[in-house]
Each structure stands twice: as structure tokens, then as C-alpha cells.
Curated annotation (Swiss-Prot):
Protein name: Probable transcriptional regulatory protein TGRD_462
GO cellular component: cytosol
Taxonomic superkingdom: Bacteria
Transmembrane stretches, start-end: none
Gene Ontology MF term list: DNA binding
Main location: cytoplasm
Family per record: Belongs to the TACO1 family.
SUPFAM superfamilies recorded: YebC-like
Length: 251
């Protein structure tokens, strides 16, 4: 199983706790504000806003919160001014990381990110130091229990996806598309009544670094620390941890 999918699974388990902390709401509200400011409030013409609202509903965010976030994005009501920033660096064993943030204070955020890297055997690098190791792609998952593998595979191959994976130790099918084709492939699956578990634009590493023992433990702690920060939107990394080692770490 890929490191990306393992981390996606860990994040999924954390979601319920994060909602209680309000972290998920905070991050989704910022995404709605930025998406609205960027491309307007009409969801039929704004795929990014549409995805953010879907995430908000999945997290059971009150409709009033969604409405106010959109109004902040259009400027109808006042609010913080957010900037989107990207940080790049290295984690344990030279793992490459890309950290996307949405912040109203870039100096504070940069300081926080730098401290997290250094306290987990990593270091923050210069812009572009690791970005070339990743490609922006569409990433879709479908629960194996939701549909037959052959049906899902034939459906997505007809839609000209880049890759289809069905790993033995995973409970989902993984589908990789061009980032521009994500919505199209997602809609093709829905037309075939195949339930999509998740669909997002992500950064896929061209190669991965296998981690074990302390390096694996420190890497997961760094990922956890970064994703727990209110300003952090996404974290991408090119590590892989075997299922056996992951079970030991979770024991």
C-alpha cells in the first residue's frame, strides 16, 4: 500500500477527534473563503468551492457557517485576509515534504512550520527544493465493498485514467487521473452508481523512501504535528511504510 493511502487512512481515523477540536471547521471555512474569493460564489462554476462545501457538509458544519464563509469570500462581510503559501523541506531519512498553508500571518506560520521540521529530525528548505519530485494529480478512492473490481476498473479505464490500483492490503481501489480530469472521472463513476469515497487533487511522488522503526515513527509524528496546525491545508510526502511496520507502530 502506498504511503499516501496509509496516511489518508490515518487522517480519516483522526477526523472525528479533530471535529471536536474545531480544527476541521477552521480549515474548511478558510478553504471556502479563499475558493470564493478566487473564483466566485457560484458552485456550478467553481469546482474548488463545490469540493469545500461537500467537505463542510460531510463534517456536519452548520449551513449558517458555510453561508458566512462564502460572504467573507465575496467581501459581503468583513474577515481575515488569507494568503496561500507553500513550504518545502525534508523529514527523517531525507523524506521530501510539501506543506500547503492558508494563513493570515505568514511570518507566524513560517516560524511554526520551521520549528516543527527541526523538532522532528527534519529541516525546512528553499522554495522548489523538492517540488520537482511530485506531480499534481487527481486521486479518487472507492471502497472495495461498494463495487466489483472489474466493474470499477472497466469504468475508469473507459474514462482514460492514468492508473488504477487494487492493493491486497487496502480496503479501497485507488484511481489516479490528470488533475484536470478529476471531476469528469468522478462524475462517470457516479453515473454508474459507484459510490466515491474521496476525490481530491493531490501531489503524487515520483519515487518513495521506505521507512522503518524510529524514522517511521518520527515521520508520522511530523505529519501529525503539521496537519494539526490550523494554518496547514495539505501535507504531501514521499515516504512508504510497510503494513507490518505500520501495525507495530499502531500497537
Amino acid at each position: 500500500m502506498s504511503g499516501h493511502n496509509k496516511w489518508a487512512s490515518i487522517k480519516h481515523k483522526k477526523t472525528a477527534t479533530d471535529v471536536k477540536k474545531g480544527k476541521v471547521f477552521t480549515k474548511i471555512i478558510r478553504e471556502i473563503v479563499v475558493a470564493t474569493k478566487e473564483s466566485g460564489a457560484q458552485i456550478e462554476n467553481n469546482a474548488r468551492l463545490r469540493k469545500a462545501i461537500e467537505d463542510a457538509k460531510e463534517a456536519n458544519m452548520p449551513q449558517d457557517n458555510i453561508k458566512k464563509a462564502i460572504q467573507r469570500g465575496t467581501g459581503e462581510i468583513p474577515g481575515a485576509i488569507y494568503e496561500e503559501m507553500v513550504y518545502e523541506g525534508y523529514g527523517p531519512a531525507g523524506v521530501a515534504l510539501i506543506v500547503e498553508v492558508t494563513t493570515d500571518n505568514k511570518n507566524r506560520t513560517a516560524s511554526d512550520i520551521r520549528k516543527m521540521f527541526s523538532s522532528h529530525n527534519g529541516n525546512l528548505g528553499e522554495a522548489g527544493c523538492v517540488g520537482w519530485m511530485f506531480e499534481r494529480k487527481g486521486y479518487i478512492t472507492v471502497k472495495k465493498s461498494a463495487a466489483d473490481e472489474e466493474i470499477v476498473m472497466n469504468t475508469v479505464l473507459e474514462a482514460a485514467v492514468e492508473d488504477f490500483k487494487s492493493e491486497a492490503d487496502s480496503d479501497v481501489y485507488e484511481i489516479i487521473t490528470l488533475s484536470s480530469d478529476l471531476e469528469t472521472v468522478k462524475n462517470v463513476l457516479k453515473e454508474k452508481n459507484i459510490t466515491v469515497e474521496s476525490a481530491e487533487v493531490t501531489m503524487v511522488p515520483q519515487t518513495q523512501i521506505a521507512l522503518k522503526s524510529d524514522n517511521a515513527k518520527n515521520m508520522l509524528k511530523l505529519m501529525d504535528a503539521l496537519e494539526d496546525h490550523d494554518d496547514v491545508k495539505n501535507v504531501y510526502a514521499n515516504f512508504d511504510i510497510s503494513s507490518e511496520d505500520m501495525e507495530k507502530l499502531n500497537a
